[in-house]
Amino acid sequence: MLESANVLCDCWRMEIDAFGFEHTYRALPEQFYARREPTAVDGPRLFALNKELATRLRLPLPTLVAHGAQIFSGNQLPPDAQPIALAYAGHQFGGFVPQLGDGRALLIGELVDCEGRRRDLQLKGAGPTPFSRRGDGRAALGPVMREYLVSEAMHALGIPTTRALAAVTTGESVVREEVLPGAVLTRVAASHLRVGTFEYFAAQSDWPSVEQLARYAIDRHYPELNGSDRPFLGLLKGVAERQAALVADWMKVGFIHGVMNTDNSSISGETIDYGPCAFMDAYDPKTVFSAIDRSGRYAFSNQPDIAQWNLARLAETLLPLIDSDLEKAVEAAREVIQNMLPDFEGKWLANMRAKIGLQTEHATDRALVEELLEIMHRCGADFTQTFRRLCDATQAAEMPSATGERFGLSSEYDAWALRWKQRLAMEKTTVAEQSDLMRRSNPARIPRNHRIEEAIQAAVLADDFGPFQRLGAALCEPYRESEEYREFEIPPTEAQRVRRTFCGT
């Protein structure tokens, strides 16, 4: 099989054209990365190709369709690819690890998309690198499928995220807790700059590299800071604002990242490294899915505090750049860090107002939202479907109590619903406009954990990717109700409920 694959590669080498890759990160000094070619695999097979994203990246679709298995497995890269593994450190569950880096991923190049935005292309699972730490550098099929489905679902939900361009099976096995099929994911990101990237150089007191990295981050993600009197303080503020908005968006849809280490905290403000991520079914602010998060550090309700903690770690790396006077630098950074949670609270409350049909601000809004969440928690109400069914409850023809019964909520809902209706009456919008706002703010479908597991099991056990394709299609338009995909709106039964998720590394 390997021989025939090599023959295909030899024939194909004459056909492949350059993709138009650029390499601004590779132009940095070599302490920022390690050069490494992908490790070839025996029998790659393309099982997912994101044609919409490929078109946005101005990639040649006929080439991807014909030769995607070879390209996206890393067996045969475009001639202008220059693969590198990025160096970074990170705080993992609060403990500092001075060297992590891309242990199984290779950045093969950057593309400027049709909107003029620079995007990284990375192969995840492409083989060992100098940062693999005795790992095999490979990815299992299940985690690749999970990241593909969830990252694309997050994009459809309107939440900043890395995206999935393609996924291939490798024809080889990987050994984790058990022997599993191998796979490679092609990830697209605004960049792969992380808080941990800054920590890597700061831990070595390599301040020239920290400054070089900070200037690169500003040029790429915060160009408005060029020419600013205090660009590095501005960088810290920019990251704080984007991370506050990102976590507020996560919590709007019940998303739990699961492993918010600083090496998984993006400077661009995107969701990155999905690992043991999951969406809540029944609302519980203390929900934890990750099997390795035994203390609940990254529970749903802890995410804003963890984002602030991660920001403080970034601030520590930037202090010498913010001001030559350490006391002044600390004071300036502290103000940014302290402002992050109030900023998050404002963004979160704005999101929650929209979820219950409100556009204007009122002093009682927070209490109104929190009371509903408390009722949902006590009753074990499904987070997604409760808010989606509230869209119907704005219609005058439906009594609040009928809506409450539909969710399985207690009689407490009736009293809350009356106060909610009174608050809606204070708005200048019509009932139809309120309902429309809610339908744009409350998805009908999310990537429910049991549905993802069903798709993974079908692929792993029976080589059946039909459930994966169908689930992916159902998640493309999450705010539009569809009879065709009604099954994906239904919460899991007790027997179907997924209680633990895994990183897959």
What are the residue ranges of the model-derived segments?
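Active-site-adjacent bridging/hinge elements
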Residues: 25, 29, 119-130, 214-218, ...
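Short, contiguous strand/loop micro-motifs
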Residues: 37-39, 136-138, 233-234
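Conserved ATP-binding subdomain of kinase catalytic cores across diverse folds
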Residues: 43-46, 51-227, 245, 267-270, ...
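ATP-dependent phospho-/nucleotidyl transfer catalytic cores
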Residues: 143-144, 173-257, 268-374
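Hydrophobic residue at the +6 position relative to the catalytic HRD Asp in the kinase catalytic loop
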Residues: 260-265
